[in-house]
Amino acid sequence: MKRIVLSEGKRDVFLVEQFFERIGRNVEIDTFHASEVAKGEVKGQETRKIQNFMERRNPYDLLVKSEGGKPDLKRIFTKLIRSLSAREMGFVLLIDLDNRPLSALFDELNQKVRGNYDGNEYGIEMTEKIGEDTDIIAAEALFFAVDDSTTSSFDVLAFKKDLEHAAGIPSPDDTDEERINELLTEYSSVRRQMEAVLL
């Protein structure tokens, strides 16, 4: 089954790519970086990328998108969740909690998705915490219509603080890929939670 991973930034995309390389799975990965597209062209290019990815002849198994930061990720997630959940594919939200509880993220997303679809009531709730370690939480969530006509599950990988803290990257401008790779050693907690969600 095809899957889409929505994430905050380029480092998150790199993390997912390296994860599959490290575990030796033959997964064809396509990427999309919103920060590399002119502001007025993001929506059109994003729509084309998703439509192309969903085509039967498309060779990719996984589309990993970076949205250019948490505010844009939350906004785009709440706009796309309805259309993406109607398709037969897996869906993963990769996000930083910035030391907030996971429940606060779900409360915020639930409030945003309810406000995005006038005339229909939708919601988001966590259904199961799959795993939790020092730096990351893996969870399963549900997008639903209040009238029970639509339900779709999706997964969440949430860094308790952020990816940079977990990897020991001292500066937001540092592009230390080696430190991100160290998060994916065979017995690391981050790798275990990623395996629980992505495999």
Feature map (PLM): residue ranges:
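Short hydrophobic beta-strand that contains or immediately precedes a catalytic carboxylate
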Residues: V5-E8
